[in-house]
Amino acid sequence: MTEEKADYEGVISRYYGDESVKCIIQLKVETKDADVVAEKVAQLPEIEDLFLVTGDADLIAKAGFENYNALKKFIVERLSKIDGVRDTKTLMVVTTFKERGKVRSEEQKT
């Protein structure tokens, strides 16, 4: 791991600590295997929602984790090892303003 990457990991770990983490994961997959990959990803309990989409990514997943380290372990040890997954990009949720059609109050925002 490069020094820059280690610094980034440290900042993220300190920011999120042991708090639960929600994220959006963009997956690039082998086009011919998109349905098979989607079925495998959908079986992972951490994945809350999964969509086949157009654009730069092929699949978009919403996922939840106990903490940042659990997210990191999931990406490295499980998701990236699924046959047909070419690349992933993880977007960590900082604040949730609206979820499942409901606007969150100030106290509910995460």
Where would I find each of the regions flagged by the language model?
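A compositional/biophysical signature of low hydrophobicity enriched in polar/charged and small residues
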Residues: M1-T110
